[in-house]
Structure formats: structure tokens, C-alpha cells
UniProtKB/Swiss-Prot annotation:
This is 33 kDa chaperonin. GO terms for molecular function: protein folding chaperone; unfolded protein binding. It holds the Pfam family HSP33. InterPro entries: Heat_shock_Hsp33, Heat_shock_Hsp33_C, Heat_shock_Hsp33_N, Hsp33_helix_hairpin_bin_dom_sf. It comes from Sodalis glossinidius (strain morsitans). Disulfide bonds join 230-232, 263-266. Redox regulated molecular chaperone. Protects both thermally unfolding and oxidatively damaged proteins from irreversible aggregation. Plays an important role in the bacterial defense system toward oxidative stress. It comes from the Bacteria. The gene is hslO. The keyword Transferase does not apply. GO terms for biological process: protein refolding. Its main location: cytoplasm. GO terms for cellular component: cytoplasm.
């Protein structure tokens, strides 16, 4: 069967608990792109991608979420950015050797998990928690406990399906303002923990959910597509260039004959020669914003 990158929300009718399931392959492949990341970093980016998708699905308004790991280890930064429409992009910055089987702590060192919520309207919110668990899922569960005080469990799997990278996961969370019995939540978490990566990668979401919860009353909502989408553009690059001084632009052109701006998220190049720079400067002087 053809794999589709999708997220499903579901609700346990007899408990005050909601769930989400996401399975990703093409989006994951595009995030990795042409980067030659070590295996451990590829795995971690897959986990971050799944986590970001699951977190954006909890939002009730138009916004973006950025989930990033940063520290003093050889993996300086790993970040995934997503929005409520399930558009995803991400990258990693490496400064040192990383073993194929490196743990989260070995990669990041002394570091933090930073989650930034940027709503279309209103103030930006940023939460920071230490890396107090051996897995990314542990750190995220700790974030929810500290920031939202909502019992939350994440179950993330990465691997391969039909020869391509694959990542998937589930989220369980007590509904805000509701009192779910701890025993009920633990029961659902124990069931969910039995899921295997191969099941999540290969089976339709309804089949996975039936296997896990066939004795419970579960409502599954329509799927939402997940896709890689980079927000870079020629216009954004042009606007950035116009923040530079005239001498700095002159020096860049004199050295290379053009300004080549590269997007690390998607690999796109935006090139501006001397004539293009002159046009931008003239437009800026006239108060005109360049178009993509």
C-alpha cells in the first residue's frame, strides 16, 4: 500500500482522555534532504518531527510551534518547526563527531528542550526544560507536566518502511479541565506502549487503533495531511539583504560576483548579481518591497 503522511485525532468516550496518532515517511525524508547526518541524528530528527506534529495538533488556534534541542555537545542544535496546518521543516547543526549509537545526552551534552509557540495573534510563548530523561519523549512529558500540568504520554518509533526512513508516534493526554482517573490513564498508556514501529509504519491508523483499544469506545476524527513545507522565498532573502550596509553588499559582490543565499532547511539557493542588488536598493529607496 502507498504510505500517506497523516495525523489522526481520537477521543476515548468513556474517559477524559484524547489521543493523536501520526505516521510520517515522505515528510521525514524531505527534512533529512541532502544532509549527510549521522544515524543517531537522523533518528533524533525523526523523533522531533513526530513530536512537533503531535504538539501542533493540540493547538486550538492558528499558530506555529518550534521544538528544538540545544546544548554544548557535538549536536549544537536540532530543530523542527511546524504549524497548525501540519506544514513541517527542520534541520540539525553538528560540531563534532557523533557515534552511530549515541544517546540523547551524548549528542546534546548539557542542554535544554525549548518549545516556542508563536500564535498568529497574541504574544509568543516559550517554555524551557532541562533534559531530565534518557529519551526525547521523557523530556516532552516533563515539559507538559511543568507548563500545562496535564498528564501526557508520548510513544515515538523510528525506523524504515519499504526501504525508506519512517517515523511515527502517539500522544495521550488528559483533557483540560477534566479529571481522568489515574488508573484509567495508566491503563490506556500501558496499552499504547505495546505498539510496534512496524505496525505504525505499515498499517492504516484505524487498524492500529483497533489493535490497541478494541475493548474501549474510541471516536476517530478525519485525518489531516502532514507535509514538508519551507517558508523561504526570494523576497525574504531580498528583504534580509536590504538590512545590510551598502559597503558590506559591495564587498560581497566584489568577492564572489554575486550574493548566494542558501536555505539550510530545504537546500534552495537564491542568487543576486550586481544588477539585482542595484534594483533592490533602488526599490528600497522608493519604499517598495520586492516580490518573490
Amino acid at each position: 500500500m502507498t504510505h500517506q503522511d497523516q495525523l489522526h485525532r481520537y477521543l476515548f468516550e468513556d474517559y477524559a482522555v484524547r489521543g493523536e496518532l501520526v505516521s510520517l515517511q515522505e515528510t521525514y525524508r524531505q527534512v533529512l534532504g541532502q544532509h549527510n547526518y549521522p544515524p543517531a541524528v537522523k533518528t533524533l530528527l525523526g523523533e522531533l518531527l513526530v513530536a512537533t506534529s503531535l504538539l501542533t495538533a493540540t493547538l486550538k488556534f492558528t499558530s506555529e510551534i518550534t521544538v528544538q534541542l540545544q546544548g554544548d555537545g557535538p549536536l549544537r542544535l536540532a530543530v523542527i518547526n511546524g504549524d497548525d496546518r501540519q506544514n513541517m521543516r527542520g534541520l540539525a547543526c553538528i560540531n563534532g563527531d557523533i557515534a552511530d549509537d549515541a544517546t540523547l545526552a551524548q549528542m546534546v551534552g548539557n542542554g535544554y528542550l525549548v518549545i516556542t509557540l508563536t500564535p498568529a495573534e497574541g504574544e509568543r510563548y516559550q517554555g524551557v526544560v532541562g533534559l531530565e530523561g534518557p529519551r526525547l519523549a521523557d523530556c516532552l512529558e516533563n515539559y507538559f507536566l511543568q507548563s500545562e500540568q496535564l498528564p501526557t504520554r508520548l510513544f515515538i518509533r523510528t525506523g524504515e518502511y519499504q526501504g525508506e526512513v519512517a517515523a511515527a508516534g502517539l500522544l495521550l493526554q488528559v483533557l483540560p479541565g477534566q479529571d481522568a482517573h489515574a488508573d484509567d490513564f495508566d491503563h490506556l498508556a500501558q496499552l499504547t506502549a505495546t505498539v510496534k514501529g512496524d505496525e505504525l509504519f505499515a498499517l492504516p491508523a484505524n487498524d492500529v487503533l483497533y489493535r490497541l483499544y478494541h475493548q474501549d469506545n474510541v471516536t476517530v476524527y478525519p485525518a489531516q495531511s502532514v507535509q514538508f513545507l519551507c517558508t523561504c522565498s526570494r523576497q525574504r532573502c531580498a528583504d534580509a539583504l536590504m538590512t545590510l550596509g551598502e559597503q558590506e553588499l559591495h564587498d560581497m559582490l566584489e568577492q564572489d560576483g554575486e550574493v548566494d543565499m542558501h536555505c539550510d532547511f530545504c537546500g534552495s539557493h537564491y542568487r543576486f548579481d550586481a544588477d539585482a542588488i542595484a534594483d533592490l536598493q533602488q526599490q528600497a529607496a522608493q519604499g517598495y518591497s520586492p516580490q518573490a
